């Protein structure tokens, strides 16, 4: 029933409403987000046709799969099966590797960075290839989460402390660069003036494509 299907479409595609569109082939699975501008159907033709116009402030198609690179001085090593003897066993392993590596198979794009842990001071993320950096001035308390978004059109720096989220973009040190991921392998390293060993850093990335 064409009329029934048309009304089902209207229930999903509503002008001025948010919409998320998925596109998939055997090689790629992506999505885009936007606001429905119009949904126009030709109701009185033998072959029903229509056109949906969607305004997308973010111009990219994003992979449905997320990649995460992590830094922590302590790497988890806990196992739920306990040893049968009384010998000591590790619940964590101390890491001397400050490098985070992530591969970008899409176009150059920004990413999300989460810094937590603490106490620490003046956390800094460096691009290992260019020495460009982002530094947040000030203290990180135990339980804090700093979230940095470097995506075009959506650059933010926020602090979540005791359940309250505040804008701290003013704590971004002068000379900092809004870091991005180039195509291919990207390496970043972590520094802090105090408390580096207590920091946990997560770099969250989805491959992004201008066309699919």
Model-derived segments and spans:
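Compositionally biased, low-complexity regions
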Residues: 1-17, 28
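Intrinsically disordered, low-complexity boundary segments flanking structured domains
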Residues: 8, 18-21, 40-42, 97-103, ...
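Generic ordered-secondary-structure signal
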Residues: 12-15, 19, 23, 45, ...
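Short, surface-exposed linear patches
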Residues: 13-16, 42-45, 55-56, 74-78, ...
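Short beta-strand and beta-hairpin "edge-sheet" elements
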Residues: 15-63
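Generic domain-boundary/flexible-linker signal
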Residues: 32, 65, 197-199
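Short, charged, solvent-exposed linker or helix-capping segments at domain edges/interfaces
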Residues: 62-70
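Intrinsically disordered, low-complexity segments enriched in serine, threonine, and glycine
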Residues: 69-212
